């Protein structure tokens, strides 16, 4: 089971991804296509429902034109 600080981090990262996606006026579908990950995974990451790999974060950040460090 995840600790509170881990859950907070997962939710914070997801929220930053969502905000950047909206800033770029992208749909979850477009982000999933650009990052080559399933659309439902984008939604779950944004809602803080799942933790994800560094590789997936890298793909998302590349699609959102940000650095991974911008998520923390």
Residue ranges and their predicted role:
Residues 49-59, 68:
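Short, basic-rich loop-to-helix N-cap that marks the start of a DNA-contacting helix
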Residues 65-72:
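Short C-terminal boundary/hinge segments that cap the last helix of small helical domains
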């Amino acid at each position: 089971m995840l600790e509170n600080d881990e859950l907070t981090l997962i939710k914070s990262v997801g929220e930053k991804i969502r905000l950047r996606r909206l800033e770029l006026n992208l749909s979850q579908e477009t982000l999933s296509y650009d990052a080559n990950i399933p659309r439902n995974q984008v939604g779950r990451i944004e809602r803080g429902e799942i933790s994800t790999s560094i590789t997936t974060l890298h793909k998302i950040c590349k699609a959102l034109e940000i650095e991974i460090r911008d998520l923390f």
